[in-house]
Amino acid sequence: MGSDKRVSRTERSGRYGSIIDRDDRDERESRSRRRDSDYKRSSDDRRGDRYDDYRDYDSPERERERRNSDRSEDGYHSDGDYGEHDYRHDISDERESKTIMLRGLPITITESDIREMMESFEGPQPADVRLMKRKTGVSRGFAFVEFYHLQDATSWMEANQKKLVIQGKHIAMHYSNPRPKFEDWLCNKCCLNNFRKRLKCFRCGADKFDSEQEVPPGTTESVQSVDYYCDTIILRNIAPHTVVDSIMTALSPYASLAVNNIRLIKDKQTQQNRGFAFVQLSSAMDASQLLQILQSLHPPLKIDGKTIGVDFAKSARKDLVLSDGNRVSAFSVASTAIAAAQWSSTQSQSGEGGSVDYSYLQPGQDGYAQYAQYSQDYQQFYQQQAGGLESDASSASGTAVTTTSAAVVSQSPQLYNQTSNPPGSPTEEAQPSTSTSTQAPAASPTGVVPGTKYAVPDTSTYQYDESSGYYYDPTTGLYYDPNSQYYYNSLTQQYLYWDGEKETYVPAAESSSHQQSGLPPAKEGKEKKEKPKSKTAQQIAKDMERWAKSLNKQKENFKNSFQPVNSLREEERRESAAADAGFALFEKKGALAERQQLIPELVRNGDEENPLKRGLVAAYSGDSDNEEELVERLESEEEKLADWKKMACLLCRRQFPNKDALVRHQQLSDLHKQNMDIYRRSRLSEQELEALELREREMKYRDRAAERREKYGIPEPPEPKRKKQFDAGTVNYEQPTKDGIDHSNIGNKMLQAMGWREGSGLGRKCQGITAPIEAQVRLKGAGLGAKGSAYGLSGADSYKDAVRKAMFARFTEME
């Protein structure tokens, strides 16, 4: 204390104080500011250390929860979008990017506020605005603004001079550069880039260890360096009932597309979407720009409520992982699937304005030259092989393996080559499936030999062939159709059915030829003359003729509706050419069969029955053909029953003023319908009449109850049951006030003990009531003291007494 310098009174006094006092005050203030800044810096360091520890040593589950808090309302999460951007600011290392980071935002700001502010500025508009939040929902003070192109981001930064004012606060803007992804891992199943700390794939749930083991080292670098861009992109996760118009509407803000630019792949059996579609653009640059726009959408692209995945149609991620041989196999399988989708969509949409070209490969793409060479070689080999089968069936055994190997490499030319086989024949579908049949232990390469006994077919051992839709029998090499129960031999191109008595496979055409020839039947019995059964070649020719007519009619309707594009014209020409070629081919066979039938037919004994008369080949039965001819003949004759010049109905012998009245008479008149029915029955033979009556009986509802009543009569109705009557038992209950209150009650005894005598009134001077109070019935709903509320009823009165008292009360009221 002695060493401290005491300030004198004169030094303390003064207007502004002494110089020493001012110096001490300045020193204390500077010391306080330094202490505050040191405390703030240390607190920031501690908070940063805690954040780093939380970020580095947290579990994957906690990290997933923290990142889920930053999701948008629709729940979309892109693994590696904003979480991979570097938040630290270094001006020297800043590079231009299409993503801009806004730092120093107010805590109360929202994403909608930032969007409204961005929309108020002129120039390019952002593609997405992302505000980073904590788990509690509070803003972390920075956000990301992403533009579609790098030029838009740089021009926007230059226009605002890297400064922005939001809610009166100056905001710093910087380019956001993503951190390197060398520590992330790529999923081998869905090709999604995942964080290094994620043990399972975010999209498909695949294990990280499996992906690292399957993908060889150096694959990721090779994938990034190879240029695998093409002019077609694929849309995945499409709803089963989505149409092309919905896809065009969803993509219209980003690209100008036509109907023929979109290929929606459908299932051949259910006619529903298979979950993906192709969008072809004019160039690879346009496809790359569209893909970049669609992948940067937040929220992502949605069509009919389904989130759509977008990628190049020919991606190098999967092709480079495979070996060269597997790559060619996958390449051909994909082409076959697209060709099959083209065939199914062409059949289902033939009446909706023509078919659409679903071919995926275009000239100039990778593998197109090799694929075209395979297609040409396969077609030449198939034509030679077909000629060899016609000349000598035994030559097929030496070339079956070659056919199989060629079908493995290129499976779709058989689908496009429609001029050699008519549509609908299993040749187009069974030939590609020979690649799968080589794995099964087939019998002889020549197939089933007629006349040889075989074991009973076991359908449980059959293998389903997706390319043809049939079931493959590995023991015989035949294809089984469960709908028609027929077998198809892909080598001889014949339909067969199983004969249980002979224990062999009998060709369908052979059975009809046996019926036409004079051979005696297997069962000998009474003689019966029958009309010949079906002529397979002749009826196939008629079916081909009807098919060609329908195609030509559809083509005429399509031309009259609107002018088609060139691709549709070529497709129509191919279909009409296939129809004409198929009709000419089967017409020759039909004429040959007709010439053979000109020989006088012998009387046949016994019944000739085809064991299988249903399904694919059973549709060519003789009865169905005669019915069609009969209907055509009757229709032509019915047209002659109307005289359109005189406007008269020759059948009903009536004349009409105009054409509309005649048509209305033919369609609505009961007289015309009755006469037409009589006319049709008169033109039929006895057998046709019996068949018609049988068909009508089968179609008509049979009232068995009416038949039973007509045969046995109506039984007499049973006597009604008498209702049981129960006598209600009388209940004796006490009525104490019915005969009046006597002197035996407790109240009377108490009053007598107090000096009261019967007949005198109550009270000291006996001025009170002399009779006991009686309960009276009041009128329902009447208030106390109202007129007519009570008319002297008591609880012990009977109904008769109550009526009498009520009548008397009303009489007195009237007076």
Curated annotation (Swiss-Prot):
Keywords: Apoptosis, Metal-binding, mRNA processing, mRNA splicing, Nucleus, Phosphoprotein, Repeat, RNA-binding, Spliceosome, Zinc, Zinc-finger. Component of the spliceosome A complex. Binds to ssRNA containing the consensus sequence 5'-AGGUAA-3'. Regulates alternative splicing of a number of mRNAs. May modulate splice site pairing after recruitment of the U1 and U2 snRNPs to the 5' and 3' splice sites of the intron. May both positively and negatively regulate apoptosis by regulating the alternative splicing of several genes involved in this process, including FAS and CASP2/caspase-2. In the case of FAS, promotes exclusion of exon 6 thereby producing a soluble form of FAS that inhibits apoptosis. It is found in: Nucleus. Residues 452-535 are annotated as: Sufficient for interaction with ACIN1, PRPF8, SFRS3, SNRPB, SNRPN, SNRNP70 and SNRNP200. Component of the spliceosome A complex (also known as the prespliceosome). Appears to dissociate from the spliceosome upon formation of the spliceosome B complex (also known as the precatalytic spliceosome), in which the heterotrimeric U4/U6.U5 snRNPs are bound. Interacts with U2AF2; this interaction is direct. Also interacts with ACIN1, PRPF8, SFRS3, SNRPB, SNRPN, SNRNP70 and SNRNP200; these interactions may be indirect. Disulfide bonds: none annotated. It comes from the Eukaryota. Residues 98-178, 231-315 form the RRM domain. The modification Phosphoserine is found at S18, S59, S69, S72, S78, S444, S621, S624. This is RNA-binding protein 5. The keyword Phosphoprotein applies. One of its GO terms (biological process) is mRNA splicing, via spliceosome. Isoform 5 is widely expressed in normal tissues and is expressed at increased levels in T-leukemic cell lines. Belongs to the RBM5/RBM10 family. GO terms for molecular function: DNA binding; mRNA binding; RNA binding; zinc ion binding. The lineage of its organism: Eukaryota, Metazoa, Chordata, Craniata, Vertebrata. Residues 743-789 form the G-patch domain. The gene is RBM5. Residues 1-93, 411-468, 507-540 are annotated as: Disordered. GO terms for cellular component: cytosol; intracellular membrane-bounded organelle; nucleoplasm; nucleus; spliceosomal complex. SUPFAM superfamilies: Ran binding protein zinc finger-like (SSF90209), RNA-binding domain, RBD (SSF54928). Residues 426-446 have a biased composition (Low complexity). It comes from Homo sapiens (Human). A zinc finger (RanBP2-type) spans 181-210. The keyword Lyase does not apply. Its main location: nucleus. It holds the Pfam family OCRE. SMART domains: G_patch, RRM, ZnF_RBZ. A zinc finger (C2H2-type) spans 647-677.
